[in-house]
Amino acid sequence: MPIRSAHHDQDATTALTAGRLPRNLRSFLKSITFRVVQTRDELIAAARLVHHEYAKRGYVTPDNSSSEIKLSLFNALPQTTTFIALFEDEIIGTVTLIPDSPLGVPMDSIYRDELDGLRRQGRRLAEVSMLAVRTDLFGRGVFLMLNSKKLFLVFNLFKLMFDYTRFLTSITTLCIAVHPKHDLLYRFLFFHDLAGERVYPGANRNPAIAKILDLHLAVEECRAANKLGIYRLFVEKRSKPEQLAQKMLLTPNDLQYLFTEKTRLFPQSSAEQIRHLQQCYPSYQFQEILGTGSHHS
């Protein structure tokens, strides 16, 4: 898989400010397909990539790694959307968008008060979650902002997610909990601080900081920042309709396999959580999905 550069860029962000990408970077990006997940196999492959990369960094604990895929109850919601980058039909990057719901969002577990403050303002939230890239393709130990191929792979995944959010949803504000070492990347993408560093049990007790992005304000900030490359990528250029088409709809069989059999997330969920899922899928027979004799039946 000919992705790794012969050397690491020392000014990978220059192209974003100048507005023109080097030829080798344009060629690399043309070889990648960016789109939404369309099948169960793709969702599993994306979840496996997340688990693999998170395990390298100590973000998953042994007790939640036995299935070797990283899924949460939020992945069962029909509004949740997973985006992927494919090279020769293999997923090499992924990110997931989790719109707010009665179940909240994952980072409510440590930033509930701050997020509730945004909700009271009328903000319609969605959390950016489960970002992962196949690091073995780009060389190890290299800061993301100094590797142009890896950086632009992430940026194009975010571009697709931004377009989906801006044009196909009513979401106003993106939120994310990230390791402090990644703060610079999100500042570069016009995310602002929401709350300071806290221990995140959901990431194996690693530190996290909370950041938010106002979608309307970000467009104006991007225009004013004189970063022509970012403006062209994220504002002027529009994702193609086929990149966002045929989004996967989880079937009863998918729900049973992924969340009852593969991960046991449904059996471990509260009755209230299962009731909300039943409301999301009113035609589905949840007694069958949960298994005979489930305590939720």
Located regions from the model:
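Glycine-rich phosphate/pyrophosphate-binding loop shared by adenosine-nucleotide-utilizing enzymes
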Residues: 90-94, 126
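C-terminal non-catalytic accessory extensions
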Residues: 265-297
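Short acidic (Asp/Glu) patches
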Residues: 63-80, 104-117
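Acyl-donor binding region in acyl/amide transferases
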Residues: 101-107, 111-217
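Extreme N-terminal leader/anchor segments
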Residues: 1-14
